Amino acid sequence: MAAALQLPMVEGDDFHPPANVARMREGIALTDADRVGWLAQLADVLQQHPAGAVLGCSALKRAYRDSLRNAVPGLRFVYLHITPAESLRRVAERPGHFYPPSLVTSQFEALQDPSGEPGVLTLDGTAPLDQVAARAAEWIKALQLATCPRPTASP
């Protein structure tokens, strides 16, 4: 998606503070308080890219998404809908990552489905990656066209 939009890709996991990473490695789910600084860092990173960026992050709760929306006007979200079982399978295939499969259930318990919120596109997260990326990029491009001022012809 980032490549299709010619935008930088930002991986949200790279911005977790060491204390959060340690908690997750130990199988301890993050609290809202644990995420405050992380969300602020993500907002800062997005603000450093005024032309746009693609951010990959969980943004599980509406409050987290609203925090990012308030910091970055015009922010849009692509929600990849998958089942807990599919998520567990994918996490298990990431050996060496600090996020253990044991935390998948807690993420789904915390998840507030963003479908229906303004500025959210919900896609089937089990569809082929190239199709998901293309659909998301098409949506963003259409939004950009809809919000860009169009030149008017001179008489």
Indicate residue ranges for each PLM-predicted region.
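Conserved substrate/cofactor phosphate-moiety recognition/catalytic segment
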Residues: 2-44
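Conserved beta-strand scaffold positions in the cores of enzyme catalytic domains, especially
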Residues: 9, 14, 77-79, 120-122
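Conserved nucleotide-binding/hydrolysis micro-motifs of P-loop NTPases
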Residues: 16, 60-61, 82-87, 128
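Loop/turn-to-beta-strand initiation segments
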Residues: 49-53, 76
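Short amphipathic alpha-helical segments
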Residues: 65-70, 89-93, 134
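Conserved phosphate-donor/acceptor-positioning beta-strand/loop module used by diverse small-molecule
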Residues: 71-91, 123
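Small-molecule kinase domains that catalyze NTP-dependent phosphoryl transfer to phosphate-bearing small molecules
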Residues: 93-137
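C-terminal accessory "lid"/substrate-recognition subdomains
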Residues: 140-155
